[in-house]
């Protein structure tokens, strides 16, 4: 099955300036992500960046770069620019791999592509079970609830679904009803073209979750349980130190 990986790599970061180029055991982080994408069997891998230094690092590692504008409001908008510049056909399967996930398993990159290809839907993603209360109540862990066919009903930073009877007795434990959304997406290129024509939705602004725009406009997102749990992503200096230790 043919698919393309696009890795958005925005240079500016409030908490970690120059994030794509931070060193992880002798390599820039973006090169680690590129290597994981290569292991997935993708037909083509493109790093989408707004900074020449990132482009040089990727090209030095033998990767392909697409220079994009610096003013995109979301990663999906950056993807849309690449889709147009590369003139991908509407049925091309695109997997969006975050540029700050150096420990992402190649298997789940492939999984989200396969998941999309097997369904008549424009967008697919992955989730993993939540087994502890700390994560269930953490607003940085985005929860998702599904219908009987595995399509997303809603994504939220809130604790959904709310286990009324269990939580009436205390908030120390959770049942087996929670899923944490992973920030990896598969799209058909034509869907990306449509997505960027839609105005941002109120729910998207409230939760700060751009995937809610898709549900707002009545489209479906299929969600599969990931075959592997990805390692730590890099958002802060503390995350960076953890990843360096785990990847030694």
Swiss-Prot record:
Main localization category: cytoplasm
Keyword Lipid biosynthesis applies: no
Enzyme class: transferase
One Pfam family of this chain: CTP_transf_3
Pathway connected to this protein: Nucleotide-sugar biosynthesis; CMP-3-deoxy-D-manno-octulosonate biosynthesis; CMP-3-deoxy-D-manno-octulosonate from 3-deoxy-D-manno-octulosonate and CTP: step 1/1; Bacterial outer membrane biogenesis; lipopolysaccharide biosynthesis
Entry EC no(s): 2.7.7.38
Chemical reaction(s) catalysed: 3-deoxy-alpha-D-manno-oct-2-ulosonate + CTP = CMP-3-deoxy-beta-D-manno-octulosonate + diphosphate
GO biological process, one term: lipopolysaccharide biosynthetic process
UniProt subcellular location: Cytoplasm
InterPro entries, A to Z: Cytidylyl_trans (IPR003329), KdsB (IPR004528), Nucleotide-diphossugar_trans (IPR029044)
CDD domains named among the record's database cross-references: CMP-KDO-Synthetase
GO molecular function: 3-deoxy-manno-octulosonate cytidylyltransferase activity
Gene3D superfamilies reported for this sequence: Spore Coat Polysaccharide Biosynthesis Protein SpsA, Chain A
UniProtKB keywords: Cytoplasm, Lipopolysaccharide biosynthesis, Nucleotidyltransferase, Transferase
Gene Ontology CC entries for this record: cytosol
HAMAP family: KdsB
Functional summary from the UniProt entry: Activates KDO (a required 8-carbon sugar) for incorporation into bacterial lipopolysaccharide in Gram-negative bacteria.
Family stated for the protein in its record: Belongs to the KdsB family.
Identification of the protein by name: 3-deoxy-manno-octulosonate cytidylyltransferase
Classification lineage: Bacteria, Pseudomonadati, Pseudomonadota, Gammaproteobacteria, Enterobacterales
Chain's gene name: kdsB
């Amino acid at each position: 099955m043919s698919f393309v990986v696009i890795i958005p790599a925005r240079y500016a970061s409030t908490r970690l300036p120059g994030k794509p180029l931070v060193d992880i055991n002798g390599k820039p982080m973006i090169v680690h992500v590129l290597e994981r994408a290569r292991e997935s069997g993708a037909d083509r891998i493109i790093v989408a960046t707004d900074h020449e230094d990132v482009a040089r690092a990727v090209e030095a590692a033998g990767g392909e770069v697409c220079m994009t504008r610096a003013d995109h409001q979301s990663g999906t908008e950056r993807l849309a620019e690449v889709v147009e510049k590369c003139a991908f056909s509407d049925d091309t399967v695109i997997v969006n791999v975050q540029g700050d996930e150096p420990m992402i398993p190649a298997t789940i990159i492939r999984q989200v592509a396969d998941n999309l290809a097997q369904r008549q839907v424009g967008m697919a993603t992955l989730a993993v079970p939540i087994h502890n209360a700390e994560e269930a109540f953490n607003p940085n862990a985005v929860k998702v609830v599904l219908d009987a066919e595995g399509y997303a009903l809603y994504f939220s930073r809130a604790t959904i679904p709310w286990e009324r009877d269990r939580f009436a007795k205390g908030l120390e434990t959770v049942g087996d009803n929670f899923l944490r959304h992973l920030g990896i997406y598969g799209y058909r290129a034509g869907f990306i073209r449509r997505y960027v024509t839609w105005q941002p939705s109120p729910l998207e602004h409230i939760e700060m979750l751009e995937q809610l725009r898709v549900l707002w406009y009545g489209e479906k997102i299929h969600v599969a349980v990931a075959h592997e749990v990805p390692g730590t992503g890099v958002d802060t200096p503390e995350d960076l130190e953890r990843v360096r230790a785990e990847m030694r």
